[in-house]
């Protein structure tokens, strides 16, 4: 059973525990700048929203990489950067429509969420349950896709 990160924005307090846990898990240091998850602050509303790679089914980053450094981890469903293969060309950062792949100056490589090998530190660290790691079927995405197919909800130009 595939699992996904599920974010409930209304529960986020902006404590940054997710960013700290991520940076510690991946770099052994508490540095939000090194985190693969970010908390966006909507200053005009006071809302905080965590965001990270959505592990797209049709991952543009994976297809765009000229050296095939981004591959699918079949166990977790995550699209993972192989740092030994990555040449730091940043094509994947341009291809990602969500801006969740970042270039790391220190290494000359890119980084993105890899779901921590199936045990995301951000979800474990979130004190409010704003970030959870749940069965993909629970999100209802499959049912929404089935309804869209049945209804033929294709965009049309008027």
Where are these regions (language model features)?
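Flanking helices and flexible, charged tails adjoining ferredoxin-like Fe-S electron-transfer domains
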Residues: 2, 31-67, 72, 83-158
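Local sequence-structure signature of Cys/Sec-based thiol-disulfide redox active-site neighborhoods
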Residues: 4-9
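A positional/architectural concept
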Residues: 10-30, 35-42
